[in-house]
């Protein structure tokens, strides 16, 4: 279920942000650009396909800073988090199995913790005055590293990820809570399908344990 990221490691190294436009309040006459600096976050969901492929979709966070007055050079700090097993075997704990009539019951315990799986600092990006909404990253051997800022939606798009600005309602804890719900739904659905196809049929009774202490540690 929660194996290490395979295809997203390269994405962690190249995800970068660019320009943020300030939103207008309902009573405001004019808008003002907030500039490129800021913290952004993205999570695109966890589905049965993630379970089947053993590839997780992490929560990505990036912090963008302008490095010159003209704001054409940026550096970005990037992090990626997902839930990893904390058991020595790095897999669910089988607590018990028993036959109940013709059906086998298996009790599983998923013991996991939100874990920092990728961190990269001071990634350099450049934008041109003729196209300020695109930042080209200085990263070797990785194609399609342009990041595009959409001023209409105030989002950053790169590959399959859409980044939104970090806020009180859109932050690591909020998305971690969403991740936990998605993970349980997807895993239970997958186990149901596996159990129905097994011989004898197996009913998985699953409990989940999520440790989010890394979030509290980061706030200290």
Regions found by a protein language model. Name each.
Residues 25-41:
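N-terminal helix-cap/turn-to-beta initiation motif at the start of protein domains
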Residues 30-32, 47-52:
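Short, solvent-exposed loop/turn elements at domain surfaces
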Residues 20-23:
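C-terminal motif of bacterial Sec signal peptides marking the signal peptidase cleavage site
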Residues 38-40, 60-64, 74-78, 116, ...:
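Hydrophobic beta-strand residues in large extracellular and virion-surface proteins
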Residues 126-151:
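Acidic, glycine-rich flexible loop segments
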Residues 95-102, 143, 151-220:
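Edge beta-strand at a domain terminus
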Residues 50-119, 123:
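N-terminal glycine/threonine-rich, aromatic-flanked beta-hairpin/loop signature
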Residues 2-11:
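Bacterial N-terminal signal peptides that target proteins for export
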